[in-house]
């Protein structure tokens, strides 16, 4: 496949060239490349090519194939799915049914990342991560309270997360990272207190990174005043001050990765109190991130690529995440001038006007999604 007249970033440098894909890799990037016999040519004039996103915090409640198609539409090529047997990234759930999993066997079967949903068996899990050189993702089970503690929770009469205790378990993993020198990614980080603790432990030699949900950078808890079930997200949204602080932290590189936190709403309850927790957002991931983070000048386009794919690829030691020769051809082609509106009524972003739209997704050199009438073939 030959991508003609592609605009893309090579590190921090904006370039324009042709990109040749073959046998799952990017094999050549040059100006004015000529197609070979029977080579598919995709015209990228006025479009932008960037590495497909990698999402490390996805819950599957809808069937894996359906989930993948939604992800491709949102520019997400690789998924780390917590529940179920299918995941684009082969993960090892350290604890199942309150028992320690057979981590050694699962690693030998191709496990790429170790996930800890609680601090049970902490010592054993940590030593497995160290011994097998596995990156450790800490994604603690949610308390499933609708709001964070504060004035709004009291005003609305909703159950709330007591913020006084939100970091007590995380600190144990922070110390393990420092003591054993294990790379650890802390998932669903959404408070400045947690980020300050991460910095303090990293200053002592820990290898910690933070991953934050897109929703918590774009929305704040004032949306709960409408009692709409689509805003019932776990963990709950922060107040405006907390949201702005997260955006500043992202701008200052204190947040390494972002996630859609996608989880389907598995109920049709109309009442906020009775509705299921969830965040149906992956099918608009690129457009949401580009609109509210890049267009709003929270971060640059280059930094968006770092927090949505480059840092994830490095954490997982994948040969992907950048538009470079000899990297995996995991790419998306986007129209940055296209305007769309979120149509999924279960999405927390429903009705919002967005900029930027995925036209084509390519994984290992093969097209997995193409928008109708997009990316003309030459």
From Swiss-Prot:
Keyword line: Pyrimidine biosynthesis
GO cellular component, one term: cytoplasm
Biological process terms in GO annotation: purine nucleobase catabolic process; pyrimidine nucleotide biosynthetic process
Superkingdom of origin: Bacteria
One MF term in the entry's GO annotations: allantoinase activity
Any matching Pfam family: Amidohydro_1
Family that this chain belongs to: Belongs to the metallo-dependent hydrolases superfamily. DHOase family. PyrC' subfamily.
Function: Non-functional DHOase.
Protein known as: Probable dihydroorotase-like protein
Biological source species: Helicobacter pylori (strain J99 / ATCC 700824)
Lineage: Bacteria, Pseudomonadati, Campylobacterota, Epsilonproteobacteria, Campylobacterales
